[in-house]
């Protein structure tokens, strides 16, 4: 219990950039934000178009206490907090859930949206929590992408 408590305490004051991608598990990002905030972390969210099919920016904003970023080409977002600044301002980047599609983007360096561009621009530790159907998980393409990312 003490070891778990010290791990949670390690998040106090840390800035976590949470990337929420498309998949039914996106709703779990809401609980993750709550737990990170409870541990004392600051949370800023990037929501992909697919992620927005499952959770709303308002829900993420209400729990994180910060604006939600989603559009790579928004003049407002770029002037306030571009993809470079989003990646620099974080101590840790977490992709949860990480859909099969987003894992492929990460593995192949595709930068066609804000979330993928942020990941290419970051030099911070990045954690991905894959979430998909078991057949998608077992597919050779997904396994190859995971091997590339490891």
Give the label of every model feature segment.
Residues 1-128, 133-150:
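A cross-family phosphate/adenosyl-ligand binding-site feature
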